[in-house]
Regions:
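A conserved short coil-to-beta-strand element within the FAD-binding core of flavoproteins
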Residues: 124-140
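Glycine-rich active-site loop/strand segments that organize a redox cofactor
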Residues: 28-57, 72-76, 80-83, 87-90
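Generic structural signal for small/hydrophobic residues in well-ordered secondary structure
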Residues: 27, 61, 113, 158, ...
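Glycine-rich FAD pyrophosphate-binding loop
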Residues: 11-37
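Short beta-strand to alpha-helix junction loop
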Residues: 47-54, 94-114, 123, 253
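Conserved flavin/dinucleotide-binding core of flavoenzymes
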Residues: 4-5, 13, 85-94, 138, ...
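A short alpha-helix-loop-beta-strand transition element characteristic
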Residues: 41, 56-78, 190, 205-211, ...
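Central helical "cap/lid" subdomain
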Residues: 145-209, 272
């Protein structure tokens, strides 16, 4: 979502913006599937916000008219042992600080940002292939769209991609220093190697049995599970993080993994859980706009924030807005917000606008000349 937010801020400052998106949708790692009535989207990417820790995200949600509700946790929690024996914990699994979810699904956030791009040209299915410093100091952006190669020229470019994709999917001319390129290739993309299974049901039947919908398992294939229903429980669902590493998932038939997950849901929540109305398996390691082969290795720890410093010939021409470049909460929604705001602030300072970066709910009346165009490419952005 960092590319969308950056484009929104730039448009409000009066910049001409072209947003290039490699996918056929916006949002990057923010992705959900719609309920039948379209009133809710079930998250297959990031789902949680922690207001005490994510103040900028909360500010933007408020500005965009989006509300939060607390993750359902009332009722007993379940623990599945390696033997597949299930133990019930009456007190459940309290989350501190409480995890909150966006009413309607996290994709409502990216939908709202997209809807506010009035003058920005948005090109979907447009994959940036290369960046060139032009003799006049502008940046040439080579892209591929519909099997055709194209190019545009921008005064500055904001890149809303994780470090690994910047290093492995883009041609840079002049080339990046080998040390920087290697450092980016070694930087894990948060949650890129993970997979998430979502099962939809007519009702949240587990609640009637006194269960919270939360479980942890040492048997698998799902390692951690939660209630994924909407705030009212009218759109019922369970989701689980797949505990099988990406390399192991590649050796499994997709349907075999789904079948094993449904059997596990039956062990945990009863026979009704085995036959959902619909089931979705989102394997982020298979998304080339998110993951590289290096992301198949499980993360040993949360990635540290990445430096945004660039060599002199790219400095002030390229600005990095991927969530992994955020000073705090890299990889999360909050990181995406912070990285986008910082990148736009740096670009604004570079181009000499006297306008102050507008925060949530603020506007600016001054505008740069239309000739000052800024390209913002987002092929993958967002949170964990």
């Amino acid at each position: 979502m960092s590319g969308l937010l950056a484009a929104h801020l730039l448009e409000r400052l009066g910049f001409g913006v072209t947003l290039l998106e490699a996918r056929e949708r916006v949002g990057g790692r923010v992705f959900g599937v719609a309920a039948e009535d379209g009133a809710h989207r079930f998250d297959l990417g990031p789902a949680w916000v922690w207001p005490e820790l994510n103040p900028r995200t909360v500010d933007w949600l408020s500005t965009l008219g989006l509300a939060l509700f607390e993750q359902q946790g009332r009722g007993a929690g379940l623990v599945e042992l390696p033997s597949q024996a299930v133990r019930r914990h009456a007190t459940g699994f309290a989350q501190q600080p409480p995890s909150m979810r966006i009413v309607g699904g996290t994709a409502r956030l990216t939908d709202a940002l997209r809807a506010r791009l009035v003058r920005t040209r948005v090109l979907l299915g447009t994959r940036v292939r290369g960046l060139d410093v032009c003799p006049d100091g502008t940046v040439g952006v080579e892209f591929e769209r519909g099997g055709q190669v194209g190019a545009l020229v921008a005064s500055s470019v904001i890149l809303a991609l994780p470090p690994r994709l910047l290093a492995s999917t883009l041609r840079w001319s002049p080339a990046l220093p080998a040390e920087l390129s290697q450092r980016w290739r070694e930087a894990p993309t948060w949650m890129a190697g993970h997979a998430k299974l979502l099962a939809l049901y007519p009702t949240p039947f587990w609640r009637a049995a006194g269960l919270s919908g939360s479980a942890v398992s040492q048997a698998g294939p799902l390692a951690e599970l939660h209630d994924a229903s909407d705030a009212e429980g009218r759109h019922a669902a369970l989701f689980g993080f797949v505990g099988v590493p990406a390399a192991g998932r590649r050796r499994l038939e997709r349907q075999a993994l789904i079948d094993a997950s449904l059997a596990q849901l039956g062990r945990l929540f009863g026979a009704e859980a085995v036959t959902p109305q619909a089931v979705y398996l989102q394997d982020w390691a298979e998304e080339v706009e998110t993951a590289t082969p290096a992301d198949a290795a499980p993360n040993s720890a949360h990635p540290a924030p990445m430096s945004t410093d660039l060599p002199a010939h790219w400095r002030d021409r390229i600005h990095l807005a991927g969530s992994e470049f955020a000073p705090d909460f890299p990889g999360y929604l909050e990181g995406a917000v912070l990285a986008a705001e910082r990148a736009v602030d740096a670009l604004q300072s570079q181009l000499g606008s006297g306008n102050k970066l507008p925060g949530p709910g603020q506007t600016t009346e001054a505008a740069l000349p239309a000739a000052s165009r800024t390209g913002s490419h987002t092929g993958e952005n967002g949170g964990a």
